């Protein structure tokens, strides 16, 4: 990974104070963490540094407390979840700067792990304020960023600290960037991208960037309806951003000029109601009834996607093909996910996927572990796919 240092470059950390930025923005219900995936992702970096004798000081944000302390957004309950995942004692300090932080850090010995309170309890965090960044840096000798999911934000703990202390990429960021490099940076071709989800409006930058970089773009979900409408196909009562038809047309023109094939549904599963047990029918795409909604792509469309996956060396996936959260409209997404997973297991495909709905869909299909890489980074993954610079990553590149 050219351009920045990883933990492999960090030779002697015994007794050093390592400020480690992690993503602990996990779901909590009634004071209990309900999903520890993000903690599990950063556990290898925490334990590696601890095992090497570093004083590991965890920096993280949680929720949106608007720059002031808020008991609802305290990281204290999360410290217990981190302890459970690591199977190690995790100390807690009631502030990330000032006397409480200094006292807790001063009491540490090599190998100890300390979680500091929510960085967003201070307005200086999101403003990337130099004074606040200095106050954070006062408790560290080395900075390691392992929060790729926050790398698209130029905040004090994700970007500012990298300018004040020797900066390194943690194992999560390293794995993420290496996977993304394989996916779009320097991929094996042909590259197929699957982009789904409800709205074109949220993914214009993404689609515009992808048509210049991939060989085939499969468009699914509600956003496919806008492209179908732009082509003059009636989509009945389906979710459709009719005001973006010209944008969709331009993306199709750009794709043609770049030599990128665009694959739209050729058939669809439609229903009059979006509810469990609704009566459905499968129709050709130019025969959608006026009173029906497209809620999934049909079997002919799935076969078309599979044909492209047979030719592809690389797959980048963001967004489901249909309304997968409600059966039977999950069928196309599940089938394509399982097919891509099989091709990956057979070493015929490099598969990189990301985005909340995509991760949920792959978990539903029980194939997350079969993909080459599944990003939990959300907004950062999307901005990377859009071709944008990520401040938290750029700050590590020296």
UniProtKB/Swiss-Prot annotation:
PROSITE patterns: PGLYCERATE_KINASE
The keyword Protease appears for this protein: no
Reactions this protein catalyses: (2R)-3-phosphoglycerate + ATP = (2R)-3-phospho-glyceroyl phosphate + ADP
Domain of life from the UniProt record: Bacteria
Localization per Swiss-Prot or TrEMBL: Cytoplasm
Pfam families: PGK
Residues annotated as binding substrate: 23-25, 38, 61-64, 120, 153
Assembly mode: Monomer.
Name the UniProt record assigns to this protein: Phosphoglycerate kinase
Originating species: Chelativorans sp. (strain BNC1)
Gene that this sequence comes from: pgk
